[in-house]
Amino acid sequence: MGSVAGARVKLTNADKVLYPAAGTTKGDVFDYYTRISEVMIPHIAGRPATRKRWPNGVEQESFFEKQLASSAPDWLPRASVTHRSGTTTYPIIDSLDGLAWIAQQAALEVHVPQWRFVAEWTRSKAEELKPGPATRLVFDLDPGEGVTMAQLCEVAHAVRDLITDIGLTTYPLTSGSKGLHLYTPLTEPVSSKGATVLAKRVAQQLEKAMPTLVTSTMTKSLRAGKVFLDWSQNNGSKTTIAPYSLRGREQPTVAAPRTWEELEDPELRHLRYDEVLARVARDGDLLASVDALNTRAPVRDRLTTYRSMRDASKTPEPVPSAKPATEHGNTFVIQEHHARRLHYDFRLERDGVL
């Protein structure tokens, strides 16, 4: 049996059962990912996709896959990241066809970081994708032994209230596994290091406020009876299960967006893929605001050509997301200039020209 998504991906072995306890087949997985693509893609587009594959179903062995295989289709976008162990080329899933390819690979889980690739100009005037700043925060609420869903939700509400106090908004998900995930969109991107520091401070503050229920410490022996508020997934080298991704559990559950009202329900549980499809058809994407703030196109002005000729990795110059309004078209600018020796430039900008 075969199927086609966007005339590019052919589904094979559609009747193969990947979730034996539920009878869910590879064809069902393919159908889910193609139908959920419209709401899932905004949360993973532009980010390196790590896949966790179960080629023989969830009762058999699985493996993580980062490096894009040489057999991957040419039309699939890709970009490379340099790690301590070497350089890895990742697929970028930004289309229905990309998600269909994920399903055909029996990659039930998709994991992404909190940053997106950004385009930079090289000395040869070629555009190259490089890891960019974080566009959102994520908190993984991991229950220790004996922790109930109600206690997880109590901690989630406390995180939400603390984040609200600093002027940001938080959106909850049931992870499809054991815990809850909380996403906070950033009004302006920040470095992954900065995002990690902020998330850690939030976790430590909650630990002080709720010491019998919350821990920000990774030591597993200290987690019994507590919620581990995992802030570390904001690190640029780490990933989190993507919103709307399936999970490789006994049942075909999903990392599913929820409402805060639902988190007050004592019967709150994880959702299956068919339930998530029905919810999206009814309510749309509950996370639509999470990845909508940082999708603006770069500002074009009289310096666009000049900046395109610079090597931003050597001498970066900050470019505002919106042109500042000035009464007479004149602006004084102080720029931190990373040349051979760090120095600061004091410049006059008149009508968009420095």
Give the location of each predicted region:
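Short beta-strand
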Residues: 52-54, 170-176, 217-221, 335-336
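Short, conserved phosphate-binding/catalytic loop or strand-edge motifs used
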Residues: 174-184
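C-terminal accessory nucleic-acid interaction domains of nucleic acid-metabolism proteins
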Residues: 1-24, 30-31, 41, 45, ...
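Subset of Sec-pathway N-terminal targeting signals
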Residues: 299-354
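Secondary-structure boundary elements
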Residues: 161-169, 208-209
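Short beta-strand-to-loop capping motifs
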Residues: 141-143, 184-186, 348
